[in-house]
From Swiss-Prot:
HAMAP family the record matches: Ribosomal_bL31_2
Keywords: Ribonucleoprotein, Ribosomal protein
GO CC list: ribonucleoprotein complex; ribosome
Similarity comment text for this entry: Belongs to the bacterial ribosomal protein bL31 family. Type B subfamily.
Species for this entry: Photorhabdus laumondii subsp. laumondii (strain DSM 15139 / CIP 105565 / TT01)
Protein name: Large ribosomal subunit protein bL31B
Gene for this chain: rpmE2
Organism ancestry: Bacteria, Pseudomonadati, Pseudomonadota, Gammaproteobacteria, Enterobacterales
């Protein structure tokens, strides 16, 4: 294995700013910012969306359409296909 070609893997704190949640995860991301969490200093990265705030994971997602593609097609073009 060649030396100095692999990124530095370390523990990083990700901060979900929309949910104000902190995640301590191993990562190779580069950042100059640091934060002290639980008495230790870690590299710090902010994120807009995480599993704490994404609607899919929180269960607050909206369903846009319940009908299938066939029903939408019939509604749109059914009058043209109707009687032969």
């Amino acid at each position: 294995m060649k030396p100095d070609i692999h990124p530095n893997y370390r523990v990083v704190v990700f901060h979900d700013t929309s949910a104000n949640a902190y995640f301590t995860i191993g990562s190779t991301i580069r950042t100059e910012r640091t934060i002290t969490l639980n008495g230790e200093e870690y590299p710090y990265v902010t994120v807009d969306v995480s599993s704490e705030s994404h609607p899919f994971y929180t269960g607050k997602q909206k369903t846009l359409s319940q009908e299938g593609s066939t029903a939408r097609f019939q509604k749109k073009f059914g009058r043209f296909i109707g009687n032969k």
